[in-house]
From Swiss-Prot:
Protein species of origin: Alcanivorax borkumensis (strain ATCC 700651 / DSM 11573 / NCIMB 13689 / SK2)
Entry's family note: Belongs to the LDH/MDH superfamily. MDH type 2 family.
Function in brief: Catalyzes the reversible oxidation of malate to oxaloacetate.
Catalytic reaction(s) noted: (S)-malate + NAD(+) = oxaloacetate + NADH + H(+)
Residue sites binding substrate per the record: 94, 100, 133, 164
Keywords: NAD, Oxidoreductase, Tricarboxylic acid cycle
Protein name, per record: Malate dehydrogenase
E.C. code: 1.1.1.37
Keyword NAD attributed: yes
Family annotation (Gene3D superfamilies): Lactate dehydrogenase/glycoside hydrolase, family 4, C-terminal, NAD(P)-binding Rossmann-like Domain
Keyword Transcription regulation among UniProt keywords: no
């Protein structure tokens, strides 16, 4: 089988829970294809290097044919050197008594440094996905610190919300997720996100016409918005495997393209489409082709949707303003 030249994939927080589900998927070819060798460049904080070494030992012990090399480091300049893809998974979790503003500031320091390291060391064509929360604003901070990289190359993950929304809808209608097309998450990866069923199709028919409005507004939307919290309550830990799966899905769609007649939700640099402030990292419906994304244009937005879209935009603007003194 013809093998392509290896690509370099940087992953941060590489000894953490999400990465433990993620790295083996990348190494097996789930993300970039079964014909694409990868060199894994794994970043951790110094105290976690020993744990990272254990993960690297396990990756070696899988003897994945597509793995052309693995490095582990606590130096961002080394981790991002010539990287073609970067998955920024590591972030400061919210500790007891921490306000959201404290969390934003703690992460701003991390993502500023990583943005600079990407700018100075990575391939200029790098594709960056931020998974670590607050993902949209962390992506914005990294992007602003990488002036030599096209802002379109920094994205935030709302694919987990997209997948959650598909599963909830399929369950409600007694269908499978294969029957669901054109799911759409607008806005922030937070409890203000807006899962929009007005353009979504199930079995080729508009989804919103197949459900009661009351269920949609008072059951479905809050369930999707608060799914992460529900998993923490049930499992005693945050969603790791499903987050890793969504990261693989996001990157695969971006790198290899979306299916004909369907789209995906991606947190991307707003160009002002749908009246959303330019420069925010906001989730839009996107199609992907040849390694590039395009916002799906011309969707009708009713008053209900507009209100929801503006509420999540407002939250993103507030997050940006809270860290604006730290942005270049």
């Amino acid at each position: 089988m013809f093998m392509k030249a290896p690509v370099r994939v940087a992953v941060t927080g590489a000894a953490g829970q999400i990465s433990y589900s993620l790295l083996f998927r990348i190494a097996s070819g789930d993300m970039l294809g079964k014909d694409q060798p990868v060199i894994l460049q794994l970043l951790e904080i110094t105290p976690a290097l020993e744990a990272l070494n254990g993960v690297i030992m396990e990756l070696e012990d899988c003897a994945f044919p597509l793995v052309a090399g693995i490095t582990g480091t606590d130096d961002a300049n080394v981790a991002f050197k010539d990287a073609d893809y970067a998955l920024l998974v590591g972030a400061r979790p919210r500790g007891p008594g921490m306000e959201r503003k404290d969390l934003l500031e703690a992460n701003a320091a991390i993502f500023s440094a990583q943005g600079k390291a990407i700018n100075d060391n990575a391939s200029k064509g790098i594709k960056v996905l931020v998974v670590g929360n607050p993902a949209n604003t962390n992506a914005l901070i990294a992007q602003r610190n990488a002036p030599d990289i096209d802002p379109r190359q920094f994205t935030a993950m709302t694919r987990l919300d997209h997948n959650r929304a598909m599963a909830q809808l399929a369950n409600k209608l007694g269908k499978t997720v294969n029957d669901v097309k054109k799911m759409l998450i607008w806005g922030n990866h937070s409890s203000t996100q807006y899962p929009d069923l007005h353009h979504c199709e199930v079995d080729g028919k508009v989804a919103i016409d197949q459900v009661e409005q009351d269920w949609y507004e008072n059951d479905y939307i809050p369930t999707v918005q608060q799914r992460g919290a529900a998993i923490i309550k049930a499992r005693g830990a945050s969603s790791a495997a499903s987050a890793a799966n969504a990261a693989v899905d996001h990157m695969r769609s971006w790198a290899l393209g979306t299916d004909e007649g369907d789209w995906v939700s991606m947190g991307i640099y707003s160009d002002g489409s749908y009246g959303i402030q330019e420069g925010l990292i906001y989730s839009f419906p996107c199609t992907c082709k040849n390694g590039d994304w395009t916002i799906v244009q011309g969707l009708e937005v009713n008053d209900f949707s507009r209100g929801k879209m503006q509420a999540t935009e407002q939250e993103l603007a507030e997050e940006r303003d809270a860290v604006s003194h730290l942005l270049p």
